Amino acid sequence: MENIAQADALLFGRVTYEMMEAAWRLSTRTVAMPDWTEPFARTIDAAKKYVVSSTLDHVDWNAELVRGDLETAVRELKQQPGRGVFTGGVTLPLALAELGLIDEYEFIVHPRVAGHGPRLFDGLSKRLDLTLVDRLELGSGAVALQYVPRAQRSTGNAVDS
């Protein structure tokens, strides 16, 4: 369940990258955060990041822009030695799921019904059956659920969502 800490890199779309940078970049933090967020903040701040964007001209925060064909770029990232790449957000994971490039899915379910907001995988062109492989109850009441596509049980150099 520690996919972000174990991943070799993070793969974000522009919106998620900008949101994560605003929230977790330690060198620009102006508001004190609760102590329990520090391990996550240090992990995300130090991680290598790849940003898929056709509108950004440059990125920093230990990041590199991904240009060109998404499938080719992600397959190249997955071929690199290591434990894999973690992704998050709404739009990019949908595109990766459509391409069959996600080896593991991790969903954090919070004990709150919002009634609005983006829907994950909205518009997915085909049904994707998943098998639960792990779960973790968090102190906040949230539950982390880890799945793999039903036809797949083990992973290597995964792109996790």
Locate predicted features.
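Short, conserved catalytic or interaction motifs in soluble domains
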Residues: E104
